[in-house]
């Protein structure tokens, strides 16, 4: 398995620190508002990466934090006349709920920053003792960037270049404009905790570094997030951890590409800003995932509702193909053509191999789905050519490949067959002489009666059956695998 490191800008063979096990951390949200679809793209991407690692036989421990104390939360609380804790609790719960709606698996560990103050203070004390951090008179504590000889390696930045763009303020209390806060002295009305430097709260970068160390140990195998976090957040996390514990922080850094909307950067001022919650009110999570995974996780993703509608249509085609394959297996007639069946079996094997090869090549979901859609065409061609005389084992294997591929991507296919209404039994008794009490058998009887009427060119009877089914919210669908009754 090859994984691209955004630190080295190269793919390399993935070798976990502990054979067969993966320790993985992805930065969670700052919980002051509903997450937008750009955030969702990152979380869905790493959900699929996690799923593929598990499917590949790894034991994965996945941690993701909730940043529940931060300037943004405090500002939102002040705007609304609420406490920071109330805002953080509301949007923490909303985040967890919408992630589940998006079929993102819960993390194994979900630490909240406000519950981890002790480990953060311990890390800051260690950094001060080792000369990598310093407290100032007002109670702030800063990390000395120049004390870390490796600073800039995660994001590819150079300290001299950073100095050119650094803001140098009057009465600067920091020793160096590049230094960043590990601990912020308390301000009136803000959440704060006791520390050796007085009341205050941790800096954002400090939170993640301390939580990774506590719950996963360092170094970890994979640290991920959106590309906007590479600098300064991930750079500063790594600097603290490396200097505090004298070990590498993460063996592989992974970052997702930006999300655009109709080719433009998403922003509220342009009116193209969408939360995940509002998108999922009108569209399925499965279609959204399918749309997002048709672009490689590192590439920019151009989102549009037209493309999302297209993904809904593709999803229906996928589900319909799987349904047709299973239906054909259950209703096979005649002697199957061995050569045709072998061609289908070969297509399954080839698509399966290509899907796996793409996923093992830096989780290339776009390539994997390309192979997958090629197979969907092959499967439908087989059903057309077989004309009901299918090889049951071959078509079931094909359906299983479709379902397995979607499952590993976290894409839940629409219900394959809605339960037929009980009224269809009386209709079949009236129109087809059916005497049983099974809805599926009743549907078969009506299909047979309709086919018989059409063969006799008795269009009035055939149309009457069609119309009566329509009144029950049903339709007869003619497929390559044969006719069947389904909900409209």
Map each language-model feature to its residues:
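N-terminal, positively charged nucleic-acid-binding surface of large information/translation enzymes
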Residues: 8-11, 17-105, 481-485
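Short, glycine/charge-rich beta-strand/loop segments that flank catalytic centers
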Residues: 66-71, 92-95, 105-120, 138-147
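Structural preference for alpha-helix termini/caps and helix-kink/transition segments
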Residues: 275-488
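The substrate-binding groove and active-site-proximal loops of carbohydrate-active enzymes
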Residues: 77-84, 108-114, 198, 226
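Short phosphate-binding/catalytic loops that engage adenosine nucleotides
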Residues: 58, 132, 474
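Alpha-helix C-terminal capping/helix-coil junction sites
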Residues: 54, 100, 128-129, 254, ...
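Alpha-helical recognition segments enriched in aromatics with Gly/Pro capping
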Residues: 1-32, 47, 118-328
């Amino acid at each position: 398995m090859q994984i691209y490191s955004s630190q080295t800008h190269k793919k390399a063979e993935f070798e976990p620190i502990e054979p067969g096990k993966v320790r993985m951390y992805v930065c969670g949200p700052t919980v002051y508002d509903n997450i937008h679809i750009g955030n969702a793209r990152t979380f869905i991407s790493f959900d699929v990466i996690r799923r593929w690692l598990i499917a590949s036989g790894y034991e994965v421990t996945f941690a993701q934090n909730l940043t529940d104390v931060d300037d943004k939360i405090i500002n939102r609380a002040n705007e609304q006349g609420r406490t920071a804790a109330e805002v953080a609790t509301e949007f923490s719960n909303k985040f967890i709920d919408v992630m589940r709606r998006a079929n993102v698996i819960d993390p194994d560990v979900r630490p909240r920053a406000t519950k981890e103050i002790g480990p953060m203070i311990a890390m800051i004390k260690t950094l001060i003792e080792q000369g990598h951090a310093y407290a100032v008179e007002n109670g702030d504590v800063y990390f000395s960037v120049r004390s870390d000889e490796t600073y800039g390696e995660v994001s590819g930045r150079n300290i001299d270049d950073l100095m050119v763009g650094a803001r140098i303020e009057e009465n600067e209390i920091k020793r160096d404009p590049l230094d960043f806060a590990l601990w912020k002295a308390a301000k009136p009305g803000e959440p704060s905790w006791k520390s050796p430097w007085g009341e205050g709260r941790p800096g954002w970068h400090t939170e993640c570094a301390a939580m990774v160390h506590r719950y996963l140990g360092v170094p970890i195998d994979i640290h991920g997030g959106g590309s906007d976090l590479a600098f300064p957040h991930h750079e500063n996390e790594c600097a603290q951890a490396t200097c505090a514990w004298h070990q590498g922080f993460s063996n592989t850094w992974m970052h997702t590409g930006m999300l655009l909307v109709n080719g433009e950067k998403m922003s509220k001022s342009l009116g193209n800003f969408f939360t995940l919650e509002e998108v999922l009110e009108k569209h399925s999570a499965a279609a959204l995932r399918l749309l997002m995974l048709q672009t490689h996780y590192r590439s920019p993703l151009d989102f549009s509702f037209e493309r999302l509608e297209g993904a809904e249509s593709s999803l229906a085609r996928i589900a319909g193909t799987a349904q047709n394959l299973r239906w054909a297996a259950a209703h096979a007639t005649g002697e199957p053509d061995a050569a045709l069946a072998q061609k289908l079996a070969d297509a399954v094997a080839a698509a399966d191999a290509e899907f796996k090869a793409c996923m093992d090549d830096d989780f290339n979901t776009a390539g994997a789905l390309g192979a997958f859609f090629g197979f969907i065409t092959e499967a439908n061609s087989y059903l057309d050519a077989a004309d009901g005389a299918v090889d049951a084992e071959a078509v079931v294997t094909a359906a299983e490949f479709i379902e397995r591929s979607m499952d590993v991507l976290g894409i839940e296919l629409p219900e394959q067959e809605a339960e037929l209404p009980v009224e269809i039994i009386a209709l079949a008794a009236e129109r087809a002489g059916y005497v049983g009490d099974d809805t599926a058998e009743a549907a078969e009887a009506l299909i047979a009666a309709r086919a018989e009427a059409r063969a006799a060119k008795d269009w009035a009877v055939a149309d009457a059956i069609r119309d009566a089914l329509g009144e029950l919210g049903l339709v007869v669908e003619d497929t390559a695998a044969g006719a069947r009754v389904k909900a409209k």
